[in-house]
Amino acid sequence: MQSRPKSTMSKSSIGKTARGFATLLLAAAVAVTGSVTAFAQAVPVVRDAEIEALVRDYARPIFKAAGLANDGVDIVLVNDQSFNAFVTGRRLFINTGALMQAETPNEIIGVIAHEAGHIAGGHQQKLRDQLERAKTMAIIATLLGAGAIVAGATTNSRGLAGAGMGVAAGGGEMAQRSILAYQRTEESTADRSAITYLNATGQSGLGMLKTFARFQSALSLSGTQVDPYRISHPMPQERIANLEVLVKQSPNVDKVDPPALQQRHDMMRIKIAAYMGGQAAATRLIRKAPGSLASRYGEAQMAYLYGNLGAALTKANALIKEQPKNPYFQEMRGDILMKANKPKDAADAYAKAVSLDPVRSGLLPVSLGQALMAIGTPDSLKKAVVQINNGLGRDKENTVGYRYLAQAYGELGNIPAAELATAEGHFYSGDYTNAKIFAMRAQKDLKRGEPGWIRAQDIINYNPSGKLKK
């Protein structure tokens, strides 16, 4: 809430008012105007090979329909229990809360389609342009108000001076409402684009309507009175009204998700509930379909998380017998065996997971490398380095992987490589200061011109703007 303005306004305070409003706009649009990398690093990210593969399967046909198939859009899972998704740059962030609350794949696919509409429509760049216009609007209003204040003071007119203060204060409000109105328009455009993509891929839009109905129900239950002109999204009921006819006229309106996809979705929900929602949340989902594959998967996860490793291993083995080609059952078996301090058996399970993985996730080789490190022999450490490097080659931003790689190199006595791996970990964490320190330390013992030396030099030359120093 803004305090009441004083009766006089200096040039300094005019500048502060204009700059303050500009800062407010920029803060509100941090995902649009800020550094994408820095913003992503501030988000509590969740990494899981199984969930990432499923969400990418949801997104692939939608991205193709939106013309984004070859644009390298990254999908990032956020550890947040609220139902939300958003885009920054070429990254689509989806909260684990949305994945757990959505009862069908179609609901999440609708969310992805909406966000794809923002990316394909270039809405972020357009919002940047709108922000610049809004800043100009606020500055002009502030200056006009200041002029009226000066005129009022010169003529000893309190009314004119008061009107001037109203203009100055109202300029920011006017610009803010302009931005919000623009954002609401873009949200509606993204909704319509989403329906287009869903139709193009032969999928129903009912999931989108269900999502908006969920928002409307939550709003009604909260009892909150919302000014529709002071929010960045249209009201849920308005969004339903705008889309309902389009959805119901579609020949795909009654299409349902394939049973195999629904099963993977159910397994994902229970997994998220077990890890992030706690025992009560997981138990609620397990009881909805007792005896199902998803419920038995959840029971195995719960046994593992709560230390009943014997039961967890028995349940995991039963799941593997039922689906021997499922890489994530083998991954879970490896997790259980690692917790049971059986790294050799865990390494065998992780190796099977890596060989079965159709999407070649970078996470699974790192898990295999971790198990090989735990074995602790020189031969297993060398194999660990190979596996972790394989994983990082597929997924360069896996900062945990660099920590394991540095440790493995250190135990093998390869200190320059350990320091370079540490530099890489800091670099992808956004800690450029320490990244440069370790890169310089690594360079001292690396041969000039070799790949490691060149990579260290790239890190040393890097600046947060994303450009190399000349």
Please provide the spans of the model-predicted regions.
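Extracytoplasmic and endomembrane cell-envelope/extracellular-matrix remodeling and assembly machinery
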Residues: Q41, R47-A49, A53, I75, ...
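Catalytic Zn2+-binding segment of zinc metalloproteases
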Residues: A116-R133, A151
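Canonical tetratricopeptide repeat
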Residues: G298, M332, S367-L368, Y404, ...
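Residue-level recognition of tetratricopeptide repeat
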Residues: Q301, D335, Q370-M373, Q407, ...
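Structural motif corresponding to the intra-repeat A-B loop/turn of tetratricopeptide repeats
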Residues: Y306, A340, I375-P378, L412-G413, ...
